[in-house]
């Protein structure tokens, strides 16, 4: 039987075995065998020691290759991390506010703003809080510098003065100390420095003299866009307000393809010739009421003529929609009444003869009788005695309304002839002209519409030997003469007014 000798090799091996499980962290971590000659730091590789040495010498061998970017870095890793900022694509997204970042560490620093239980580094001397450990160390270094300790709390490097220490602290985070931004970008033509490269490019117009921004209102040029914007708000504020309030789609004022309703007061005025607009104002209410009667008759025949295309002297080639004309609307005077004019009162309009004349015109519409017997019968309906004397007798039994005579039914009969009523058109005369002038007001009609128009001609001397005129309408003839004289002249109006009072 074998005996166990103390100090046996197998026993030594068993006692030197490492227990199973995880190794200690200190045993697996390589030793820092490469110390820095300028400070007390040591590194586990030559590459890390070399990168650290750049912090003492200020050398940055890895430069950015982008145009207009002068940044340089101490390591290749930091250069690649910086190159991501030039890319338009931001791959790191915040899950709380959907903000995008180029770098992961920027996103990590941003997430502290959303975390209510975030770790805050608080300074015991002044009470300030910091989200990052690097910012907190930089802040502690500032307190140490003010107290006389010129050692950097980040890299434990000692400096000879406070100014050098402050400049060294800027290199750790790339930010200025104390929250004050540094003007790192200098102009190539002068000694001015700026915060960003964009400010440098904007400043270059001072040296080049280029003014590429033009004001659209006064043609003044500016070298910078913000100067143009300031000029627009200061000098052209009213123009900017008009641009904001005006609609984008403006109608063409010269041509139109749709029917435009015209105001009732302007309709008879626009139908006048341009010479009569200034020479002959409306001085008679009877003339205006004649126009109201014609408008009513034109509207009543709207089944055959929906749109009346008129040639207006005002340069408006738009068709007039007659549906917009109200038949009951009285036309207002453009000029005040003169001394020879008179207004029609409401009691005069309500004379009993108004209904009889209206029924007579309806009888004329149904068919105009050609024989003298029918004419006498129609005149008897009016209640006019053939033996009545002239109007100058002042009998006053028959008073005619000086207002407009409304036509309730459309006058579409082609046989309609007002010569039987007014008796001043020759029997065998030429046919009426399609272009009819009513009261020297010049309303134009087509041949189809001219059958309902009234024609004024100079009064004819009545031939007593003509059997066609001896139909017993002497009083009607005298009435028509006074009626037509009131249309043409204004001097006989007072006499006409006195005769019917």
Swiss-Prot record:
Q: Which residues cross the membrane?
A: none
Identify the main location. nucleus
Q: Which GO terms describe its biological process?
A: gland morphogenesis; multicellular organism growth; negative regulation of gene expression; organ growth; positive regulation of gene expression; positive regulation of glial cell proliferation; regulation of DNA-templated transcription
Q: Name one GO molecular function term.
A: DNA-binding transcription activator activity, RNA polymerase II-specific
According to the record, the residues making up region (Disordered) are 1-30, 366-406, 447-474
Tissue and organ expression note: Expressed in nephroblastoma.
Identify the GO cellular component terms for this protein: centrosome; cytosol; nuclear speck
User: One of this protein's Pfam families, by short name?
Assistant: zf-C2H2
**Which stretch carries the motif Nuclear localization signal?**
22-25
Keywords for the protein's UniProt record, in alphabetical order: Activator, DNA-binding, Metal-binding, Nucleus, Proto-oncogene, Repeat, Transcription, Transcription regulation, Zinc, Zinc-finger
Q: Where are the zinc fingers (C2H2-type)?
A: 34-56, 62-86, 92-114, 121-143, 150-172, 185-207, 213-236
Which residues lie in Low complexity bias regions?
A: 366-380, 455-467
Compartment(s) where it occurs, according to its Swiss-Prot or TrEMBL record: Nucleus
Family statement drawn from the similarity comment of this UniProt entry: Belongs to the krueppel C2H2-type zinc-finger protein family.
According to its UniProt entry, what is the function of this protein? Transcription factor and proto-oncogene whose activation results in up-regulation of target genes, such as IGFII, leading to uncontrolled cell proliferation.
Looking up PANTHER family in the UniProt record yields: PLAG1 LIKE ZINC FINGER 1, PR DOMAIN ZINC FINGER PROTEIN
What is this protein identified as?
Answer: Zinc finger protein PLAG1
Give the source species: Gallus gallus
């Amino acid at each position: 039987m074998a005996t166990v000798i103390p100090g046996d090799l197998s026993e030594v091996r068993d006692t030197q075995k490492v227990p199973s499980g995880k190794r200690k962290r200190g045993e697996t971590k390589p030793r820092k065998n490469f110390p820095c000659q300028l400070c007390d730091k040591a590194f586990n590789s030559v590459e890390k020691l070399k990168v650290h040495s750049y912090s003492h010498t200020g050398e940055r061998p890895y430069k950015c290759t982008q145009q207009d970017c002068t940044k340089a870095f101490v390591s290749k890793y930091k250069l690649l991390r910086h190159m991501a900022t030039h890319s338009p694509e931001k791959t790191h997204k915040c899950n709380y506010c959907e903000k995008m970042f180029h770098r992961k560490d920027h996103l990590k620093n941003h997430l502290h703003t959303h975390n209510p239980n975030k770790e805050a580094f608080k300074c015991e001397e002044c009470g300030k809080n910091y989200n990052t450990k690097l910012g907190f160390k930089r802040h502690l270094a500032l307190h140490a510098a003010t107290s006389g300790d010129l050692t950097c709390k980040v890299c434990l490097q000692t400096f000879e003065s406070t100014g050098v220490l402050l400049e060294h602290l800027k290199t750790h985070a790339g930010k200025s100390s104390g929250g004050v931004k540094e003007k790192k970008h200098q102009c190539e033509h002068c000694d001015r420095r700026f915060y960003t490269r964009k400010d440098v490019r904007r400043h270059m117009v001072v040296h080049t003299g280029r003014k590429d921004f033009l004001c659209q209102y006064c043609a003044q040029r500016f070298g910078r866009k913000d100067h143009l914007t300031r000029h627009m708000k200061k000098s052209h504020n009213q123009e900017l307000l008009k641009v904001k309030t005006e609609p984008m789609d403006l109608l063409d004022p010269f041509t139109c393809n749709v029917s435009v309703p015209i105001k009732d007061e302007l309709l008879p005025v626009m139908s006048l010739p341009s010479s009569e607009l200034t020479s002959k104002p409306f001085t008679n209410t009877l003339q205006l009421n004649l126009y109201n009667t014609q408008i009513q008759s034109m509207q009543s025949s709207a089944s055959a003529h929906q749109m009346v295309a008129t040639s207006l002297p005002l340069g408006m080639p738009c068709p007039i929609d007659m549906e917009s004309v109200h038949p009951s609307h009285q036309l207002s005077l453009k000029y005040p009444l003169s001394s020879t004019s008179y207004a029609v009162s409401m009691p005069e309009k309500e004379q009993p003869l108004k209904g009889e004349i209206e029924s007579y015109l309806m009888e004329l519409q149904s068919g105009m009788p050609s024989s003298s017997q029918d004419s006498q019968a129609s005149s008897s309906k009016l209640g006019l005695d053939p033996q009545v004397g002239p109007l100058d007798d002042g009998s006053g039994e028959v008073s005619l309304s000086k207002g407009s005579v409304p036509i309730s039914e459309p006058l579409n009969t082609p046989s309609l002839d007002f010569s039987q009523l007014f008796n001043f058109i020759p029997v065998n005369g030429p046919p009426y002209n399609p272009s009819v002038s009513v009261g020297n007001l010049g309303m134009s009609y087509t041949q189809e519409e001219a059958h309902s128009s009234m024609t004024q001609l100079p009064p004819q001397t009545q031939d007593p030997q003509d059997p066609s005129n001896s139909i017993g309408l002497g009083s009607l003839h005298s009435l028509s003469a006074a009626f037509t004289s009131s249309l043409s002249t204004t001097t006989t109006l007072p006499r006409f007014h006195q005769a019917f009072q």
